[in-house]
Amino acid sequence: SEDNKMGMAVFGQVRQKDGFDSDGDGFTELTALKAQTLGMRSYLKTGVYSKLTAEYHHLHEFRRGGDNLNLPPHEAMIAEQVEHGINTGSLRFDWFSPDDSHRLAAFASAQHISRSSYYGAGMDPDAYGATANLTWMAGTQYIRKFDRCIFMPSDLTLGLEYNEDRLNDNMWGYGRVTSQLVRIGSFYAQNEWKNHRWSFLLGGRLDKHNLVKGVIFSPRANLRFNPVDNVNLRASY
């Protein structure tokens, strides 16, 4: 818009190439390819100190290699074929206070992958497979900037996240079926004291994985020292 309160960018691409057989033996060295890509990113300023951002990406890709590319894969002597459909979207809200001492973000994203494949030789009718995968996450983050906390300016960061991953993978002809659901809930906190010469960071993260007993704690510590402007010494744990 003319007042820059909202905007959108859209892109797309189509790509296609034939399979390449360099020595004329009837088998490709480079696969045939068909691909379409579409995406967008938009934003809306909901206030002087807040903004909403949305993104979406779509990819469809088909690849085929081997011989007799015009026939179904199981009618070729050697065939490698894979087709992907990938859709990804995200939504994010950002807010900060007039003096920038408080920042808050809330976000969510998801991705769905659909994959069908064939990897076989000798006209094998059992070499087909299919995969479906849905992953999504949501969370929030808060940052508080202090002009002085105990002995130095600092930034306090707190956050919550939740991730879920559902996977179904099938190769029916070989009797292989995989189904898995993973859920992870997380909380993290850290405080970083810093000035132009020193920085001290202490923090930790708690993760609860549905396939792991108990809560996983991951500590974090970082020390930075700049004896002169062009020298940076750092130790991390």
Regions found by a protein language model. Give the residues of each.
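Hydrophobic, lipid-facing positions within transmembrane beta-strands of outer-membrane proteins
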Residues: S1, M6, Q36-M40, G85-L91, ...
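Structural signature of outer-membrane beta-barrel channels/translocons
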Residues: S1-E2, Y43-G47, D94-D100, Q141-C149, ...
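Short sequence motifs at beta-strands and strand-loop junctions characteristic
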Residues: E2, L30-K34, A79-G85, A130-L134, ...
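Repeated loop/turn-to-beta-strand initiation elements of outer-membrane beta-barrel proteins
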Residues: K5-M8, D18, V48-L52, P98-L104, ...
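Membrane-embedded beta-strand positions of outer-membrane beta-barrel proteins
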Residues: V10-G12, M40-S42, A54-Y56, L91, ...
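Transmembrane beta-strands of outer-membrane beta-barrel pores
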Residues: V14-D18, H58-F62, S97, A110-S114, ...
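Flexible loop and strand-edge segments within Gram-negative outer membrane beta-barrel domains
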Residues: K17-T37, Y43-K45, Y49-L104, A110-N133
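Structural signature of Gram-negative outer-membrane beta-barrels, strongest in the C-terminal barrel
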Residues: F151-T157, E161, N170, G175-Y237
